[in-house]
Amino acid sequence: MSEGDAYEDFMMSEDEEMHYAEMEEDSDEMGVYEEETSQGAEEEVPLDPSSSIVEGRYYRAKGLKENSKFREAIEALEGVATSSEPLWAFRALKQIAKCWNFKGAQASEGYQDGVRTALVRLLEHGLRWRQKLGAAYVERSLISTLRMLVPANSQNFVFDEAHEICLPTIEFHLRLLDAVAPLPGDFKDLCTLHMQLRLENLIWRERLRGADCTAILSEAPAPQLTAETLLLLLQCHICRFLRLCQPPAQQFAELVSELQDRAERSLALAQQPHAMVLLAFAQCMRGMQQQPQPHSALRTHFSACLQGLEEIGSNSSFFRDLNLCGFVLADALAYSAGRCSHRVDPFALEQIRILRETPIVHNLQLLYESYVALDLPSFARALDLLAPFRSALAPLFARLCALARERKLWDAIAPLHSCIALADIQRLLCIGSSSLSRDSLLTLMMQGVMASSARVPFRLDLTRDYVYFGDEPRVQLRAPAARPGLRHCAHDLGLTSACARPFQGSSALQLMDCLSEHRNRAASAAADPADAVCRARQPLAAYRTLAALILDE
């Protein structure tokens, strides 16, 4: 085999060879106004000179069809279809089916009955005369006619919005397919197409009815696993996942692996945006269920989905917004994993920048910015605005909320407080209506120690439910009963009994100098610049009050 032959085999999969042959040898079936060629039939069936009269009637009738005079064309073609010439009768029946198909586009009366009758007559005539007409020619003609009357919905995802697909049309297509069943087994390509179209329309019927699409897979006969069928089965599992938010079944993983293998072997399949979007989103579904979640890989897969949808031209759909949301969530999670130096602002990417004025991007920006700034109230508002996507992306949202609380605890609360009650930490870590229980907080703190993410040492006083942050044990300052508010002020400044002991016997001036130095060091070491600003705004009167408190000790 030469290098050219090998390259052609690589470029063309087995599933595509049949379609290529149809376009090359049976071009008369690919369009309504193209000339009849059917070279295969002419080679197999030499034309009889006596058929010239029938031939002339056929082309005159075809001219009427080309002038959109469908009713007159059907009447003229009926005369050819009932003639004693099998070839011209077969061609006339094909043209009648085309006429009815175009009359259907004009919403004419009797469209469904006319199409069904025309298709059944074409099939019966082809089977009766297939020996004389040539089985290959008959099968190609039936395949192209069936594709015309029952077009595939390959441009729409089963799980996404599809306003142009309606239930009555799907049900008519199923009746049309049932009318020509069963098909002869020796017409393998026709049988494969029939089974594939029937499965597709059954899936769409269940989807438009709001039922579970995967139930059809167990009821319908197992189809031949072509690339088109594989994509259909994969869409069923994705539809079920988005609808019920349940982890995909084992069969789903097998379908993903099969599609990935085929895409690696077939360049034509790998260049289909619909197929690659399905593959990338399926990998996102698998990644979200893994522990730990591969955030960088998820970010890559969601980005591939967005690029594929841009190629398809899906400018406004739930599925596009879902992938947009997943991409930003994965980027935020990767940010938390310490990859800040290698990050690219997600909102600077072209796919998102062109949508910057849309509500979904505004909501995602609020979520992202509040997460980075550890502003949990704003973070909670953003979560509420993204409620339509929280069930499908539940693992990512749950992980982001957990990381937001973890970062808030160790980056904002622990450096700022020397002693704080567990109840106060629970209040500070509340995200909207989702509160953190005492046991969950203690678990979070213990996990921080075990994972070395606890940036500040701490001690727990479980008798009084206090947490002491810092390198050395600290005890709260004792405030006189007449001045209970001083205790809170001391805690906000990080003053404890460990700070008070060196001040015993000191002058007020020395005390103020030590307090100022201690405060400046704390402000410069704060992890969050907002904390330093907050401390710097404490009034000088607080120092004087605390000085009196410490001297009283």
Swiss-Prot record:
Protein's UniProt name: COP9 signalosome complex subunit 10
Superkingdom in the source lineage? Eukaryota
Quote the InterPro entries the UniProt record gives: 26S_Proteasome/COP9_Components, PCI_dom
Q: Quaternary form?
A: Component of a COP9 signalosome-like (CSN) complex.
Q: Its GO CC terms?
A: COP9 signalosome; cytoplasm
Cellular compartment(s): Cytoplasm; Nucleus
Domain named PCI is located at 298-474
Q: Which gene encodes it?
A: RRI2
Q: Which cysteines are joined by disulfide bonds?
A: none
Role description: Component of the COP9 signalosome (CSN) complex that acts as an regulator of the ubiquitin (Ubl) conjugation pathway by mediating the deneddylation of the cullin subunit of SCF-type E3 ubiquitin-protein ligase complexes. The CSN complex is involved in the regulation of the mating pheromone response.
Keywords annotated in UniProt = Cytoplasm, Nucleus, Signalosome
Q: Which species does the entry assign this protein to?
A: Eremothecium gossypii (strain ATCC 10895 / CBS 109.51 / FGSC 9923 / NRRL Y-1056) (Yeast)
Q: Where is this region: Disordered?
A: 21-47
Residue ranges, compositional bias (Acidic residues): 21-46
Q: Name one GO biological process term.
A: protein deneddylation
